[in-house]
């Protein structure tokens, strides 16, 4: 494992530090500043009863994370990558469509509008108020402008806050989520990093928090250039358990919801394989023996996500910094993907 010098922090990580330093403040401002547009989207959702969430990269992970939250309110929500929607489209008629793109300029966003023209129930979610997406569709616009650093950090937190505004307009109580944003968790990640010191691959997994697991896997692989991927808890159980062992790190997300016991069972099984297991835990349950557990305030939904996310971000950054000298500076990708 490559360790970077203590007196030098890669430029790319310095850029991420700047984004993260203001992400919670920007998230609260985003919630406060988008109430009226959120009400318009909520009205559309009540009328259609369906929600098609479209995005790419970290935006798709956000969509996957909020998908169950809308379903819990009786809205038939489905998150699909824009690339899949372009090639094998679901009907947009009779559905509210919400397209998420932090830059508002990705290639798939431009092509989707060029080919479909959108609909009267098509909305956007972006960090850039002058972007193509913001000019083309009514948008929720996050505070703070475009995220400049590679790997999504602030853009995730702000996007979740914009969804909190929509969920609040649908009748959900945002108080706990906002309270967590105002006082972010500061868990020590040292034990988790030590547990993963010798892993060659990481798999992240959750049940209701699967979208958060997918966001972490993406960030881990972008920054560390180590193979990191995500499997929903049931999918991990059905066959891929065969890959687990001392060289495969497992990260699980457990919230205070009806799926918590299933995540617990997976933690027990993963420990039995000899794999190092880190659990981000907002369930209020006892830690599973043999795991490295980071405990958070008992919560579910966006409150759980807001609790865990900044700590998970610090974990992925430190994991990457220990492995590559220029973590945070992409060598094969760009911040805004303008090609398909």
Task: Name each model-derived stretch.
Residues 2-16, 137, 269-340:
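Phosphate-moiety recognition in structured ligand-binding domains
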Residues 46-188, 241, 246-298, 306:
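Glycine-rich phosphate-binding loops that contact phosphosugars or nucleotide phosphates
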Residues 111, 222, 235, 315-317:
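Hydrophobic side chains within alpha-helical segments
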Residues 18, 22-25, 32, 64, ...:
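A broad, structural surface signal
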Residues 12-49, 139-249, 259-260, 323-340:
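Active-site phosphate/pyrophosphate-binding segments
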Residues 68, 218, 313-317:
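Short, residue-level hotspots on alpha-helical faces of the histone-fold
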């Amino acid at each position: 494992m490559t360790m970077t010098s203590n007196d030098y922090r890669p430029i790319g990580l310095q850029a991420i530090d700047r984004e993260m330093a203001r992400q919670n403040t920007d998230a609260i401002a985003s919630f406060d500043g988008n109430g009226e547009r959120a009400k318009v989207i909520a009205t559309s959702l009540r009328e259609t009863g369906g929600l098609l969430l479209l995005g790419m990269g970290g935006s798709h992970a956000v969509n996957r994370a909020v998908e169950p939250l809308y379903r819990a309110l009786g809205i038939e929500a489905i998150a699909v990558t824009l690339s899949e929607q372009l090639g094998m489209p679901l009907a947009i008629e009779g559905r509210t469509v919400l397209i998420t793109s932090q830059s508002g300029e990705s290639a798939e966003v431009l092509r989707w509008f060029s080919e479909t023209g959108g609909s009267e129930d098509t909305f956007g979610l972006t960090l850039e108020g002058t972007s193509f997406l913001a000019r083309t569709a009514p948008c929720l616009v996050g505070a703070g402008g475009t995220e400049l650093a590679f790997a999504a950090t602030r853009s995730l937190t702000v996007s979740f806050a914009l969804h909190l505004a929509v969920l609040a307009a649908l009748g959900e109580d945002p108080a706990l989520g906002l309270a967590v944003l105002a006082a972010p968790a500061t868990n020590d990640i040292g034990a988790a990093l030590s547990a993963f010191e010798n892993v060659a691959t990481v798999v992240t997994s959750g049940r209701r928090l699967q979208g958060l697991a997918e966001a972490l896997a993406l960030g881990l692989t972008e920054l560390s250039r180590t193979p990191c991927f995500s499997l929903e808890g049931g999918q991990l159980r059905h066959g891929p358990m065969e890959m687990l062992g001392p060289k495969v790190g497992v990260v699980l997300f457990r919230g205070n919801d009806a799926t918590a016991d299933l995540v617990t069972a997976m933690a027990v099984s993963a420990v039995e394989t000899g794999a190092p297991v880190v659990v981000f835990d907002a369930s209020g349950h006892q830690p599973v023996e043999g795991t490295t557990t980071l405990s958070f305030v008992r919560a579910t939904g966006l409150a759980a996500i807001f609790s865990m996310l900044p700590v998970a971000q610090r974990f992925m950054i430190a994991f990457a910094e220990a492995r590559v000298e220029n973590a945070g500076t992409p060598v094969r990708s760009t911040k805004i993907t303008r090609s398909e």
